[in-house]
Every structure is written in structure tokens, then in C-alpha cells.
């Protein structure tokens, strides 16, 4: 399989799919075409004959900077498309969740090669992989609270399996930026390496040389641990719908755009 779009390129070699985000001018930020490309690419790879492993990376200065700023501007001026996030369009997930969850559903291991920044949705995309190889200068953040939102894109059920509960709460409540070294200490980084893509491709080729039936069986077993993720995915959507478009959420966006401290009313939910 070789595929090229305005957002993602895919090349196959020796059973390894090299998937790259290529919206370089926007640090691979997530707009509607990028969401669609992530969902569609994962779906096509699920049935790719001979697939043994996947490496997911970003071209340019960053892995993925998160949600496109144009979407936050739409929240500010009231033109945001507030769809019914609770609608399950892809099994357990809605469309934006599937951009991450689809990589969890692949029957083969996925390695994220991360450099630069992985913020918000970009962070969720990274943790949607089975393993994460980080460059030493990588910075990460659960950024949603900065914009008055709750973590989404399947981040909460995945994070709950990866880190301690208090670490999860710290990152989600504060939205603070943390380093590759901190990510390693939290259990969010598999390796820290100078050239994460090269090392990830080497690891993927090593995996591709193992019994593919056993590899797929291992992933099925590990994905089955921890219970049904469906309720957590739905709760994530419901809570997001409660805050999107509210005065406090719009104030968070405006304050960030205007580079000032927000002025929130007392919480109502």
C-alpha cells in the first residue's frame, strides 16, 4: 500500500507501514481533513494484506500541535460546529475519537515516533499508539483545559490505563507542558532516542519478523485488559458537550486569543 493525501502519506516496506502527518506549515494541526485522513488511513490499514507493524510520525517541526487554531477561533465567534458528540459513528467512538481509537483497533502494533510538540489532540494521537518513542526535546500536554474543555479524542480511557490516577488528574486539571523525561517517568514514553523515527522503524521491522499470528494474538489479549472502554468514551463525549459553547468555555478561548487572564463565572455543573 502506498497512499498520499494532502494530510497523510503512507508507504509500505517489508510489512511495515510508514505513516506520516504532512501538514508541515501548521505543525500537523488537526483540522477536518486531518481528522478524516486519520480515520480513513487507520480503516484502510486494518485490512491491508501483509501488514505487520505501523510507525506513525509527523513531518516538519512537530509530531502534532493539536487542534487547529481555526477551530478555536470559531468557538470564539460562535460559528463552531457543535455536533452531537454522543453519537457513536464508529462503534464505540465518535468521529474525533476514532482518529485516535482507530489506531488502537489495528490488529498490529503501532509505534508513535514523536518529536517537537504533542499537544492536546496530538498528545492523544501519540498515546493511541502501542508504544511511543520520543525525541529528547519533545514536549507534551493535555491542553484541553487551556481552552475550557475536557480531555477528549479517547484520551481519558487510554490515559487511565497508562498512568497513576493522581498523575492523570494533575495533567488534565492543569494542562501543564511536560518533557520527554517526565513522560518516561509517568509511563507515557517507551524510549527516548535522538532519532525516534529511525529507531521506531527498526523496532517495527523487528516486530515484523516475528510470528504475525502470535503478534496479533498478543495485541488482542492486551487490548482486552481493563474492561469495556465504551462507557468511558461515551462519558468523555457527554462531558465535552456540557462545556462546549458555554460562557465559561468561550471566555477561556477569548482569553487565550487575547492573551489575558480569563474571568470565569461560578461553575454551574
Which ranges hold each PLM region?
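Glycine- (often His-adjacent) and acidic-residue-rich active-site loop
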Residues: 58-99, 118
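Conserved CoA-thioester-binding segment of acyl-CoA-metabolizing enzymes
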Residues: 1-59
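Acidic, divalent-metal-coordinating active-site segment for phosphoryl/phosphodiester hydrolysis
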Residues: 175-182
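Terminal low-complexity tails and localization/encapsulation signals of metabolic enzymes
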Residues: 1-5, 254-269
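C-terminal long alpha-helix characteristic of the crotonase
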Residues: 24, 133-138, 189-235, 241-247, ...
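CoA-thioester-processing core
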Residues: 98-107, 113, 119-173, 186, ...
